Regions:
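N- or domain-start disorder-to-order transition segments that initiate the globular core
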Residues: 2-47, 519-525
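Active-site recognition of the HExxH zinc-binding catalytic motif
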Residues: 64-76
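Active-site-adjacent "gating/activation" loops or surface patches in catalytic cores
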Residues: 32-47, 283-291, 299-303, 342
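Short acidic-hydrophobic surface loop/beta-edge motif
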Residues: 27-34, 270-283
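Charge-rich, well-structured scaffold segments of protease-associated domains
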Residues: 1-11, 59, 73, 77-80, ...
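Short pre-active-site segment immediately N-terminal to the catalytic Zn-binding motif
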Residues: 55-65
Length: 525
């Protein structure tokens, strides 16, 4: 038994595997916390910019955006740190190099990083208390503030019943972007039977159907140690961090009675090739857009997913790339882009048009098929493929995404680990993948992949966003509906709404208690 295995065992962790990985300039250790069921990956190297993240598998089961609202809400105070905005306080007092949280279509991630070990322990403490012991159970106003609530605005005949809330307003903005609406339409067409048919961020129509009880129930079911993926990164004291995790959170949580894990399903979609999907949207005619999508395979097929990304760059990465050139010359849109959507169970390739002309969706399908056939039969420009391969390798090696390496690598690891425990570190390795693909360039591999993706693929879809009316007309129709809803309220209902808003404003404006602020950890000067 190695020293690390002994340390792990002393804190309730079972060492599963240790593997040197040159791409992370260190060793990846996989562990399992027996009592709680938590998974843990320790990426051990000499990086002084240390990182911690905890991720939960949170597949959406509807369009209410419950996990997006939870991501916001758990960071509004917790049992141990009952302050309203710990984020704001930590940004002032911590040496953090990264402090954020993210909602994905099927997971919610809470990463932090710091160059100071004590600071990282402090940040970890705040985050773990937030996700496992949030104030949402004793302060319903958090749900109203971050999720949604109703308000009465205006006076007399102009009075309107409106919905407000941080996530609600955020998604109204996000889904006023045609590209976002197009992606959602394409994803729903490709995956009609799985979580990816839903907008995990929430839609303005569905968010107000989420109840406070449903909000809490989703937290109880998904924010559990046996649904958690913990990643430690950098040059840090394993004994200290594993001990902290075990003694402060995992062991106490394991001691509490709980039922079997019951999270929303995250299944695989059987191949589908539905009729083209048209999504009406109140937007200007020049915002019309269209896309075709082709499922590449499963996330575990690492080399195939990387190869598809290289292929898309080769044929769509620049204006002179073959498929993009043909699409632009056809005059069916102002611009064309291609990319691979990963960090999902079944990654897919997308060719998308912006500023699409009428009939562009049909033309897009025909042009993609014809050009793919020409390239598959006549051969790709091998120099173009090699250049795309070298660029992809450079991007992976440099990891220059504006985040600390520990955060980037945690996100990379979760792009594969979430879907399979067989090889959690698969998405951290890339040298062998690129070496293999470099050999295959001359063997016709990319031409074969082109044929498999675009010509012989029985899992594909097409979607378009069709402008229906001006933004102004849509806004006036919405306002008219809000005025009508306000007029239909009884006096008691209106009074109840006003009182709830008054209580919310009072809670928002009340300062944190000095004793609560003092509980937040700070580095000694």
């Amino acid at each position: 038994m190695t020293d690390l295995e002994q340390v792990a065992a002393s804190h309730g962790f079972t060492a599963v595997k240790s593997e040197p990985i040159s791409e992370v300039e260190g060793t990846v250790h996989l562990m399992h916390h027996a009592a709680s069921g938590a998974r843990l990956m320790f990426i051990e190297n000499d990086d002084a910019n240390k990182a911690f993240s905890i991720t939960f598998k949170t597949p959406a089961a509807d369009d209410t955006g419950v996990f997006h609202i939870l991501e916001h809400s758990v960071l509004c105070g917790s049992e141990k740190f009952p302050v309203k905005e710990p984020f704001v306080n930590l940004l002032k007092t911590s040496m953090q190099t990264f402090l954020n949280a993210m909602t994905f279509p099927d997971k919610t991630m809470y990463p932090v990083a710091s160059t100071n070990e004590q600071d990282l322990v402090n940040l970890m403490d705040v985050y773990l208390d937030a996700v496992f012991h949030p104030d949402i159970y004793r302060r319903p106003v958090i749900f109203q503030q971050e999720g949604w609530h109703r308000e009465l605005e205006g006076e007399g005949e102009g009075e309107r019943l409106v919905v407000n809330g941080v996530v609600y307003n955020e998604m109204k903005g996000a889904l006023s972007e045609p590209d976002s609406v197009l992606y959602d339409g394409l994803s729903a067409a490709l995956f009609p039977d799985t979580t990816y048919r839903f907008e995990s961020g929430g839609t303005p129509a569905a968010i107000p159907t989420l109840t406070y009880e449903g909000f809490l129930e989703n937290h109880r079911r998904h924010y559990r140690p046996d649904n958690a993926y913990i990643i430690l990164y950098g040059n840090l004291d394993a004994d200290r961090f594993l001990g902290f995790l075990d003694e402060r959170y995992l062991a106490p949580l394991a001691a509490k009675e709980r039922g079997p894990l019951d999270i929303n399903p995250l299944g695989l979609q059987a191949p589908v090739a539905p009729a083209p999907v048209s999504v009406p949207m109140a937007t200007a005619p020049e915002n019309a857009c269209a896309a075709v999508g082709f499922v590449i395979g499963r996330a575990a097929e690492r080399e195939r997913v990387v190869a598809a990304d290289i292929l898309m760059d080769a044929i769509m990465g620049a204006n002179e790339s073959p498929l993009k050139r043909v699409l632009l010359d056809a005059g069916i849109a102002d611009d064309a882009i291609g990319y691979v959507a990963d960090s999902v169970a079944q990654p897919f390739a997308v060719v998308s048009l912006r500023g699409a002309r009428p009939g562009a969706a049909d033309a897009l399908r025909a042009i993609v098929e014809a050009e793919a056939r020409r390239l598959a039969e006549g051969g790709l420009d091998r120099e173009l493929v090699r250049a795309a391969l070298s660029h992809a390798e450079f991007v992976m090696r440099e990891r220059n995404f504006g985040y600390p390496d520990g955060v980037v690598l945690a996100m990379s690891a979760m792009a594969g680990w979430l879907y399979s425990d067989d090889d959690p570190a698969a998405y951290l390795r890339f040298e062998d993948v690129f070496a293999s693909l470099r050999e295959k360039v001359e063997e016709g591999y990319f031409e074969a992949l082109l044929r498999e993706l675009f010509l012989d693929n029985d899992h594909r879809a097409c979607a378009e966003v069709v402008p229906t009316e001006s933004d102004e007309a849509a806004e006036e129709a919405e306002a008219a509906g809000e005025r009508e809803a306000a007029a239909e309220l009884t006096e008691d209902e209106a009074a109840s709404i006003r009182e709830a808003v008054r209580a919310l404003r009072e809670a928002q404006e009340a300062p944190d208690a000095p004793e609560a602020l003092e509980k937040l950890p700070q580095l000694s000067r």
